[in-house]
């Protein structure tokens, strides 16, 4: 599997290979989502609940004319049987999974969570955005499958 994780100028293609880039290539939709999150953070800053940031992101995405779904239920199959479901924060334009956080620091389980969401949705791009960051750009990670 070719998993790409970007954070702080690095992009990981696998667990053993790390490539550092000054500027990671992003698509226009990803840039628009990040711009919306920056606007939310600029207006309200860190320290709110994740659910509040989700509502504010929905407003910004609407203002930007970007289609999205909130709180999307994703079935979890096992051997052909449904064993449960996950609830995604946002799916944008049926292309990008956006998982919002308001936490002190990123935990490795968040990376596993978004990678699982990408696999379950068959989508290739995910954004993990932690609004509880002093500088939001330090709280954004991009994932590629």
Task: Give the predicted meaning of each segment.
Residues 77-78, 83-88:
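Basic/aromatic recognition patch in beta-strand/loop cores that engages polyanionic ligands
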Residues 33-42:
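A short, surface-exposed helix-loop junction/capping segment
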Residues 1-21:
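Short, low-complexity, charge-dense intrinsically disordered segments
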Residues 101-145:
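Nucleic-acid nuclease catalytic cores
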Residues 62-77:
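A short acidic/basic microdomain associated with nuclease active sites
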Residues 45, 68, 88-106, 117:
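Conserved catalytic cores of phosphodiester-cleaving nucleases, focusing on short active-site segments
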Residues 26-31, 46-50, 54, 58:
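Nuclease catalytic cores
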């Amino acid at each position: 599997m070719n998993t790409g994780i970007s954070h702080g100028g690095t992009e990981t293609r696998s667990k053993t290979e790390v490539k550092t880039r000054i500027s990671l290539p992003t698509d226009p939709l990803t840039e628009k989502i990040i711009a919306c999150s920056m606007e939310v953070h600029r207006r309200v800053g860190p320290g709110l609940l994740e659910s509040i940031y989700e509502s504010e992101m929905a407003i910004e995405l609407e203002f930007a004319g970007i289609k999205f779904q909130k709180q999307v239920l994703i079935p979890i199959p096992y051997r052909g049987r449904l064993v449960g479901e996950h609830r995604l924060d946002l799916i944008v334009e049926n292309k990008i999974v956006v998982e919002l956080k308001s936490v002190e620091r990123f935990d490795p389980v968040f990376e596993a969570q978004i990678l699982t969401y990408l696999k379950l949705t068959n989508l290739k791009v995910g954004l993990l955005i932690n609004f509880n960051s002093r500088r939001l750009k330090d709280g954004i990670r991009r994932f590629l499958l």
